Amino acid sequence: MPHGAEREASPAEESAGTRPLTGEEYLESLRDAREVYLDGSRVKDVTAHPAFHNPARMTARLYDSLHDPAQKAVLTAPTDAGDGFTHRFFTAPRSVDDLVKDQAAIASWARKSYGWMGRSPDYKASFLGTLGANADFYEPFADNARRWYRESQEKVLYWNHAFLHPPVDRSLPADEVGDVFIHVERETDAGLVVSGAKVVATGSALTHAAFISHWGLPIKDRKFALVATVPMDADGLKVICRPSYSANAATTGSPFDNPLSSRLDENDAILVLDQVLIPWENVFVYGNLGKVHLLAGQSGMIERATFHGCTRLAVKLEFIAGLLAKALDITGAKDFRGVQTRLGEVLAWRNLFWSLSDAAARNPVPWKNGTLLPNPQAGMAYRWFMQIGYPRVLEIVQQDVASGLMYVNSSTEDFRNPETGPYLEKYLRGSDGAGAVERVKVMKLLWDAVGSDFGGRHELYERNYSGNHENTRIELLLSQTASGKLDSYMDFAQACMDEYDLDGWTAPDLESFHAMRSASRDLLGGL
């Protein structure tokens, strides 16, 4: 278990079984020796720094909800590796009902961030929740898989992942960029000494551990064949963050001016491993060139991650649809027919992603040891549709709200200034008696969602996090080719073609009307 996530159970807790961390325990677990760097300095305490304080509290809300009697029925289930309770998605589903309840738990947590936390703790449960049923895949490290399945359930541990190699030269295989890509430098009795870098470690500063793996083109050198987890406070692990939207909001704005970015920034980072010792008990795959390439296809992680992502995006689109409707209302544009058609389109995208999430839950495929996976075809359809659907929704917002997104004052202080406040109340008011503050509040929230640095980052995320725009299409083709479905579609088309030829219908119950056509030709030939 990551050092920072340890806690002692009281006698009452021990008799009652294990339980997830509370929000305060989660925050305390982050106060360790992790090396997080931002703006040229090491962050001493991520729970107190303006870049991470509010995002950490938004995550703490999730942990606290697991202990709320009013929410436990939706969010939690008994652990299947012990005698406590956990977030439902950390367990392996064995029925359609389990998956439908998993969907509800994912959606419930997503609503607490209005759909804007793509990497909440349950996201990596897409992997952790497979480790019990699929432990044998990780031989000779199967016991590690079973232990992490149990421990992640018991505490609802928060993992990030970093699979991608730094794109220093995408034309070269990993073996030829060995000084950059994660690789094992040496083996010791205590574990593997590892160096290199991984991207993009979204939200990693506020997690308990990093999950690293080779991902991409085949490799030839076993030192790159590594799948493992690293505690965030491991010696030699460094987190180098991108600019913080939360810190910028705290410095130059306010919650009113930056209502999303000031509390929901999942900071993306570079993970640097400099001679990091990874204990053997934290290794899942090492040195097996074949197995490391099978991880995506045989771990069950992709099917579960797309199920989680599709459900979260459906929630997010409900938020955007509601906010867009408020913006159209407050600008007096809601009754224009063209505007109504495009709001209807946004609702159609919302319905599409909920339908794909429902299809994934209600049409699962059998998997290992009596467990089920969400339907992979629904998941692959989601991965493609999100790449065109989310940008289209943003385009509609920009098209129909238009300059209203920029027709705002710079700061809340403008309303308090007696020289500008009265003018703003007069010239920035909304329709149907809405005051200027109400109108600007809507527009600033919408701008943060679609036009700010935070909003732009989210568009990039939704477009790319589940695969590049070509792979999502190719993988659909390869999947349906391998399963024989594409052949069956071709056979279906051929069945139609087999019912006719140059001489007419070959089906005995259909009439080709040869005599009628012959008479018609004779008639036309006489003209």
Swiss-Prot record:
Keyword Flavoprotein: yes
Amino acids binding FAD: H161, A162, F163, P167, V168, D169, R170, T202
GO biological process terms on file: antibiotic biosynthetic process
InterPro entries according to UniProt: Acyl-CoA_Oxase/DH_mid-dom_sf, AcylCo_DH-like_C, AcylCoA_DH/oxidase_NM_dom_sf, HpaB/PvcC, HpaB/PvcC/4-BUDH, HpaB/PvcC/4-BUDH_C, HpaB/PvcC/4-BUDH_N
pH-related activity note: Optimum pH is 6.0.
Catalytic activity: (3S)-3-amino-3-(3-chloro-4-hydroxyphenyl)propanoyl-[SgcC2 peptidyl-carrier protein] + FADH2 + O2 = (3S)-3-amino-3-(3-chloro-4,5-dihydroxyphenyl)propanoyl-[SgcC2 peptidyl-carrier protein] + FAD + H2O + H(+)
Region (Disordered): 1-22
Family recorded in the similarity comment: Belongs to the FADH(2)-utilizing monooxygenase family.
Name of the protein: (3S)-3-amino-3-(3-chloro-4-hydroxyphenyl)propanoyl-[peptidyl-carrier protein SgcC2] monooxygenase
Annotated organism of origin: Streptomyces globisporus
